[in-house]
Amino acid sequence: MGGLKFHVLMYPWFATGHMTPFLFLANKLAEKGHTVTFLIPKKALKQLENLNLFPHNIVFRSVTVPHVDGLPVGTETVSEIPVTSADLLMSAMDLTRDQVEGVVRAVEPDLIFFDFAHWIPEVARDFGLKTVKYVVVSASTIASMLVPGGELGVPPPGYPSSKVLLRKQDAYTMKNLESTNTINVGPNLLERVTTSLMNSDVIAIRTAREIEGNFCDYIEKHCRKKVLLTGPVFPEPDKTRELEERWVKWLSGYEPDSVVFCALGSQVILEKDQFQELCLGMELTGSPFLVAVKPPRGSSTIQEALPEGFEERVKGRGVVWGEWVQQPLLLSHPSVGCFVSHCGFGSMWESLLSDCQIVLVPQLGDQVLNTRLLSDELKVSVEVAREETGWFSKESLFDAINSVMKRDSEIGNLVKKNHTKWRETLTSPGLVTGYVDNFIESLQDLVSGTNHVSK
């Protein structure tokens, strides 16, 4: 693609689920000849540098994350702390403003992409730059945040769906996010998001109109500014990396589509009793299974938290793993037939691209909305039933898995048919590149009207 070449400064929130989608987009921009300066904490550099496909066009710069009372000394990323302490890390991010201004002065970008650093538009204005609020959660999540305080389960006026909502029984997902800190740490998450949306020059969302067009229109109307879509921005398949030999060997012992794979993301830490119930539910399926979760609260290892006698009973067909796994490669293995997921936004796209049946057990508010989008709106998955406390039983987990894995299951056939349709849509030739090309053209138009100010 020809036209104006521009330089973007990206400053994502210090969470893997934010930094990696920013970098996926950076790769798409760099592929077209644009330059990206990517600002992240030092600890995140090792994790991300191997995902940089264009190191000549994408340059990492590190920020020093100041210490904030209440956080362990040296904390730089969300993965190091409980989710309830994220507000403290956001406060630490706010303290990097001087460093960001120094980088802007040094590299002279044309645009700044950001998400939770709500003060970026103020910085950009001082330098005569335009800003892009890049949303890497679902459009439905953002749409639901624009009119807070309503009754759970009741769509506010103009909201585009009666299905993609938090219901009364989902109140537990909000409690999971409530801060346990007594220190005044500035704006809360909702305030950061809404301020960023209102003060940015444009809003960009990592989604496709085919999936969330009605929510994107709602956001554009409510915020009274242009909403650009990048498309799903899938990472390029890394043909040089293969699935770890331990999993290749283990999976090769099972029939196609027979293994149940469960992964709940890097943020989710279950209570011990819920962790054990998860394990027992997987055992009930009678299927071979792999569960990849962090050790539960109060346990330093997976093994010490397993139900009594569990390892012996599932020996040879069940594995519970407490470390990172190659989720996309596992989902593409022919033996894996069902994916039990928390439905984080990244995992949502990975599940849609897979051939697996999808069972969802969300833990946080945005994951619930993603789940409703897939289960109730698109009808490509099944949600695990749970109580108002958020508790799900081994029986409800078994029922959900069985409903999609059982031969001749009516619901299993329905979600498989719908899933196939949406997967074919998302992988249709030209869809992703079309979104990226249109997005870049919109950025070129934005930059061409920018007047830089030297400082």
Curated annotation (Swiss-Prot):
Top EC class, one word: transferase
Biological processes, Gene Ontology terms: anthocyanin-containing compound metabolic process
Family of the protein in this entry: Belongs to the UDP-glycosyltransferase family.
Cross-referenced InterPro entries: UDP-glycosyltransf_plant (IPR050481), UDP_glucos_trans (IPR002213), UDP_glycos_trans_CS (IPR035595)
Domain of life: Eukaryota
Keywords from the named record: Glycosyltransferase, Transferase
Full protein name: UDP-glycosyltransferase 79B2
Disulfide bond residue pairs: none
Enzyme Commission number: 2.4.1.-
GO MF term set: UDP-glucosyltransferase activity; UDP-glycosyltransferase activity
Entry keyword annotation includes Mitochondrion: no
Bilayer-crossing regions: none
Positions annotated to bind UDP-alpha-D-glucose: 266, 325-327, 342-350, 364-367
